[in-house]
């Protein structure tokens, strides 16, 4: 029952959005089609194409270089290439605006050095669709890098040896052998990056790029058009569910069998001279542009800022962020335990369906989840308030939608898949014989969970708590839409200050978010270094 309750909670936003869109009437969707729908669709589609190509090129190229070749500092780059994953794309957007915008250090230096006026030269506009795509590529390519690297490591060395023996040069062998074998894993990584792209709100909103994500927020808040927001959410939901199906299909194909045991593996290709330094540049560029330069820019802005991170106001933002993140992380992991244990104890179609439904939330953008939860619970609040007024002459107000608990539910729906993945990864260590031994001693399912599973799963569960905690700290669209009045977090404060062009003030909360985001990246780096 608990497992299905969790699954139904994940399904509720999608059903509510669909119902609200269908009951919104045709006038709203006709108006959207005549005005902004085409622009939203075109910008979202173009962003998907650019991010897909960018993450593929950077992620696959870097993975092949560090796996199949040897050059100076290759071990360092194996780990360093993961670090940009700690940066939310909207934080990178703030940093690069301070560097590349008209008053930024790059253009200011150009004008001072060359004696140019503002109209004497052309400079690429960072606040554009191309700029937004670049920010997303820099923080999302590690998805492709990690999966492609794992695939290259798992491939049989004999296939590469055979290709080389038949006269193929290393580059040709990569294109004809390594790349096709890694295609399912690479496709899964690109699709994960695309899911994050369509869910992004902070970057595209700050750069003024109109997508479905920004359209939902504008319709809900600026125009008060709930039906329009729901219909836009359905469009975005269709994108997301299609990607979820594709990602699941690709992940299902990404299975490899090592037939090379006992065979000779092709030694890594040693690069020398110009080739070696080109490899260093190609692997170093994503790290420099995705982590080092933004971090230096944020630290410089923070140093110039008059904001005091230890003031009562900022401590309140920190407290709000920590309360939301820790509460959501614990409850999400508890829900993952309930669902994962149900799937183990009751294998079958019912448990498999519950698990599939629960995982859909990761593919659904935060803005869609927010609208999908606010619509039914706002109706419930209004109905309850009307009944209490009529019966007891007492107003209950926004009992549910005005609390942090509905926001926590949104986080649970959004990040349950991540917690389930960590839980199931640890569950492979719990052998079926342990369950049988527990039953033979007269222990029931709950006792087996408490005394057998949980002690073994503790490291995986702590990892799940950490992953969800950090994801909640970085989540922006759901928090912006659903937070109670005057209940701001670090992400909201950073977005608000950056939107007001107060980048120095936005730097401090952004640095805290990045520092917290480094925690799971450190765990990933340890795994990369170990394997």
Model-based region annotation:
Residues 201-241, 272-276, 301-316, 472-473, ...:
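Interhelical loop and adjacent transmembrane-helix boundary motif
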Residues 53, 83, 87, 91, ...:
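Transmembrane alpha-helices
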Residues 17-53, 68-69, 74, 118-126, ...:
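Periplasmic/extracellular loop-to-transmembrane helix junction in inner-membrane transport proteins
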Residues 16, 50-82, 94, 98, ...:
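Transmembrane-helix boundary motif in ABC transporter permease subunits
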Residues 12-15, 19-22, 57-62, 91, ...:
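Membrane-embedded alpha-helices of multi-pass transport/permease systems
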Residues 1-16, 75-81, 237-244, 267-297, ...:
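N-terminal signal-anchor/first transmembrane alpha helix
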Residues 73-74, 142, 146-160, 164, ...:
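C-terminal transmembrane helix and the adjacent membrane-cytosol boundary/short C-terminal tail
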Residues 26-27, 35-38, 73-76, 93-136, ...:
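Membrane-interfacial helix termini and adjacent extracytoplasmic/periplasmic loops
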